[in-house]
């Protein structure tokens, strides 16, 4: 085989020139294009990654906002429920208090009405009893209005403690004796004798005429009260009647005035 070195050399030179030309006008531009495309792809990838990161951040922010809104809504609903419950309790408490006040006021009104009715009945009964007693006594002898009450008054006086009886009439001041009418000399003497016996020492009396007693005698002093009269009996009877009526209605009876 014969090798033509000049031809081979020329071909080698052609190859080198071709390689230079390709490198100059093909490989470098293509490499530049590839590098530019790679850089563009890398940039796009970076932008996509940044966009994805931003999207993830926005989604997390939105999730947090939704959670915050849900928490705030739940808190607002709970607060509204608590306020409504407290307001309801306040309204109910005020209503119960007002109802209690109305009940107490109604009870007080009923009690006052019953007491007024009982007092009116007591006054009517007392006046009726006085009228009846007056009519009955008008048929009796005048001496019966006094003589029949001397012994009972003396017994009541004798029942007082000794210390009190000792002080009654012990000074020069006479014992104040209330009588339904003026006493005769005999009645005055009978009262003086019997009361002195009950007291255990002599005592003078001063008669104070009180027609409202109807019949009977009374001794009314700051430290001792002894009553034996129709008026006192009527007062006790009226009080007993009122007390009985009040017990039936469950109310406290008004106390009648003592004559």
Curated annotation (Swiss-Prot):
**One GO CC annotation, please?**
proton-transporting ATP synthase complex
**Pfam families linked to this entry:** ATP-synt_B (PF00430)
The Swiss-Prot or TrEMBL record annotates one GO molecular function as: proton-transporting ATP synthase activity, rotational mechanism
Q: Where in the cell is it found?
A: Cell inner membrane
**Keyword vocabulary terms for this entry:** ATP synthesis, Cell inner membrane, Cell membrane, CF(0), Hydrogen ion transport, Ion transport, Membrane, Transmembrane, Transmembrane helix, Transport
Q: How does it sit in the membrane?
A: Single-pass membrane protein
Similarity remark: Belongs to the ATPase B chain family.
| Protein name, entry field | ATP synthase subunit b 3
């Amino acid at each position: 085989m014969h090798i033509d070195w000049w031809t081979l050399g020329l071909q080698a030179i052609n190859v080198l020139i071709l390689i230079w030309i390709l490198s100059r006008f093909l490989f470098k531009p293509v490499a530049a294009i590839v590098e530019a495309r790679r850089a563009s792809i890398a940039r796009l990838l970076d932008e996509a990654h940044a966009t994805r990161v931003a999207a993830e951040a926005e989604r997390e922010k939105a999730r947090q906002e939704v959670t915050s809104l849900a928490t705030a809504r739940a808190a607002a609903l709970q607060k509204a429920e608590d306020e409504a419950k407290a307001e309801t309790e306040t309204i109910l408490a005020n209503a119960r208090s007002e109802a209690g006040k109305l009940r107490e006021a109604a009870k007080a009104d009923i009690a006052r009405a019953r007491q007024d009715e009982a007092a009116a009945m007591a006054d009517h009964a007392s006046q009726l009893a006085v009228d009846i007693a007056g009519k009955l006594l008008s048929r009796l002898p005048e001496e019966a209005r006094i003589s029949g009450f001397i012994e009972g008054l003396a017994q009541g006086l004798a029942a007082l403690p000794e210390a009190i009886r000792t002080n009654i009439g012990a000074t020069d001041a006479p014992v104040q004796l209330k009588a339904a009418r003026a006493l005769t000399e005999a009645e005055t003497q009978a009262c003086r004798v019997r009361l002195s016996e009950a007291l255990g020492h002599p005592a003078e009396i001063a008669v104070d005429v009180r027609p409202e007693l109807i019949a009977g005698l009374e001794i009314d002093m700051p430290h001792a009260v002894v009553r034996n009269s129709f008026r006192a009996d009527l007062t006790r009877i009226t009080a007993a009647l009122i007390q009985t009526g009040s017990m039936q209605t469950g109310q406290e009876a008004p106390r009648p005035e003592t004559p």
